[in-house]
Every structure is written in C-alpha cells, then in structure tokens.
From Swiss-Prot:
Catalytic residue list: S44 (nucleophile), D169 (proton acceptor)
EC code(s) of this entry: 3.1.1.-
Gene name as annotated: cotR
GO MF terms held by the record: hydrolase activity
Domain PNPLA: 7-182
Key word Lipid metabolism present: yes
Xref: PANTHER family: INTRACELLLAR PHOSPHOLIPASE A FAMILY, PHOSPHOLIPASE A2
Taxonomic source organism: Bacillus subtilis (strain 168)
Subcellular location, record wording: Spore coat
Identification of the protein by name: Putative sporulation hydrolase CotR
Length: 320
C-alpha cells in the first residue's frame, strides 16, 4: 500500500458534475477513500471539489451543493460569448462559492494538504505575469489566503469569465494538477517517489479534433472584427465558427487546456507507473458552460465501470 495518497480533480465547468458523481460512487464503495487521502488538488471547478473535501465536506454534500447552487451560475449566457463577449456573468459563481465556505476559512485551517494552480496576470515582485501554485504545505506563503478566494482565482477562465483579483483560470498552467501534486509531495513533504500514489479524476475525454488544412491561419481574421455575417467568417486559431461537432470553437485556448491535461497525465504516469490511475470516461463533445448537459453527464458517470479504479484504490488506499 502506498504511504502517501493524492487525489486530483480537473477543471471543466459544468462537466465537474462527472468527476463529482464518479467520486461519490467511489466513496460509497470505498468508505475510507477520503479519510486516507493526504492531498486533494484541483484546478478551476476541480479546486472547488478539492478544497471542499479538504475542509471536511463529504462528496455527497459537495455534489448536492454543486447541483443546487453552482450550476445556476452557468445558466445565463451573454450574447456573443465567449467569442465577442465575456460569456458568463461571474457574480453568481462568486456568491455560490463564498456561501459554501465560512467567510474566514483559510488554507491554514484545512484538514488536508491542497494544491491549486492559477495564473497571476501581474506580479509586482517579479514585474511580469506568472503561474501560481496555491498550497498549504509547511512554509507556504499562502497559508492566510481565504479558501473561497483561492478557488475563484483558479476559476476565471479567459473569455468565459473575468479575471478574479488579477488571477485567471489555472488551466493555462495545469488543467490536471497531478504532476504539481507529486512535486509538492516530494519537495515539501519529503516523501520518496516510490511511496506516492495518485488517483486523478477528469471531467470527461471528448473526441475534440482538428483535421483541416491550417495554412494561412492567424489568431484572428480581419473579418472577425465587428462581423456582418457570422456564417462566412474565415477559420483561424482564435475562433472556428464554421465547425463540425467535434471541432473546437476556440482552437488555441482549447488546445492549451486539452493538451496540457493529457501532458500532465503522461508525465505523472511515467513518474509513478502503476501507482498512477487516471479515471476520465469518454464523453461526447459537451459544452463546459451549459447546465443542460449535466443529466447526461451524470448518466455516463453512473454507467462507468469502476472496477479498475476500485482495484487501484484497494491496492493503494487499503482495504475497505
């Protein structure tokens, strides 16, 4: 059995329902799963899950609040978003996150270790922008940060939501924070690599692809600026309006988010071998900002075969 156990949660907006339902099924079948986990880490909506668990909330309670209070914040979509306008008003999401946690709850107060990626648009100390990995390991400069602020700093996805306190969504750093979590376990907790196990729970693997000639593409086209006819816009790396169902709407941004998620899994698997397990069921190309997809996402989570994950948990978290 591994001596140091980490659980990670990807970003993914409304698709966070998938990872939460998978977690609920796993926790029911493995009652000691949460109590025997040393580190919870997550990005964007995954940071909400991670810090909820680290603060002592149950998977069931977290999922229920997600469905009742977090999802409604995604129900209002502004005209033109996310291409020509910020897609979602952020105020509802901010209120929902703040209401779930005590107003004065700080990272130092959490029962478990956490790692949450974000990206700071300007650091006065460095005089540039910079990745940030919020954590509460000993010596952390972030111990007095409010839990709700850390979640919101990790969740402001460019084009979908606005920056929060000069921070944007952690997906520009790590959609899947598993490698960062391993690094903190080794570097901050002094745990040998061969004693670490990671259960990494995603928000669904979609068949996103781009199979067209990209010669001549820029980030935007002149016709994309105040367009008169959206149907005749030329394709580019910034936005692809004439797309098939499995092509990305925002090619460059979605490559960053999707690519680094796969990369993190590859690196973590190479570091840990069979002590790394990725649970990320295949899903259709669902919207990450549409609450209407949640029933279908929950159904996929309920039909996912958890036997391999349960075997991994039994081996590395201990018997039920």
């Amino acid at each position: 059995m591994a001596k140091y156990r980490i659980m990670t949660f990807d970003g993914g907006g409304t698709l966070g329902a998938l990872s939460l339902q998978l977690l609920n099924r796993l926790a029911r079948q493995n009652p000691k799963l949460i109590s025997r986990t040393h580190v919870f880490s997550g990005n964007s909506i995954g940071s909400f899950t991670a810090l909820a668990l680290a603060s002592g909330r149950s998977p069931r309670e977290t999922l229920q609040y997600f469905e009742d209070e977090i999802l409604p914040a995604f129900s209002i979509s502004r005209p033109g978003g996310p291409v020509f306008n910020q897609q979602l008003p952020y105020s509802g999401f901010i209120k929902a996150v703040r209401n779930f946690f005590p107003a004065d709850l700080q990272l130092i107060d959490l029962r478990k270790r956490i790692v949450v990626p974000s990206f700071k648009l300007y650091s006065q100390k460095l005089d540039r922008w910079t990745p940030v990995l919020f954590h509460n390991f000993p010596g952390s400069p972030y111990l007095n940060e409010k839990v709700s602020d850390v979640i919101l700093r990790s969740s402001g996805a460019p084009a979908t939501q606005r920056a929060y306190q000069n921070y944007v969504d952690g997906y520009v750093v790590a959609t899947n924070p598993s490698t960062a979590s391993i690094a903190f376990a080794v570097g901050k907790a002094n745990v040998p690599l061969d004693q670490i196990a990671v259960l990494s729970i995603g928000t669904g693997e979609a068949p996103t692809r781009l199979r067209r000639d990209t010669r001549g593409w820029g980030m935007v086209s002149a016709d994309n600026i105040r367009p008169e006819n959206l149907k005749n816009l030329p394709p580019n790396w910034g936005v692809l309006l004439d797309r098939s169902p499995n092509e990305p709407l925002l090619p460059f941004l979605q490559m960053i988010a999707g690519g680094n998620g796969y990369y993190e899994s590859m690196v973590s698997a190479n570091l840990l071998g069979d002590r790394f397990f990725r649970l990320d069921p295949r899903i259709p190309n669902f919207s990450k900002t549409d609450p209407a997809v949640v029933p279908a996402v929950i159904e996929i989570a309920n039909k996912t075969n958890l036997q391999p994950a349960n075997q991994f948990i039994e081996k590395n978290w201990g018997s039920k």
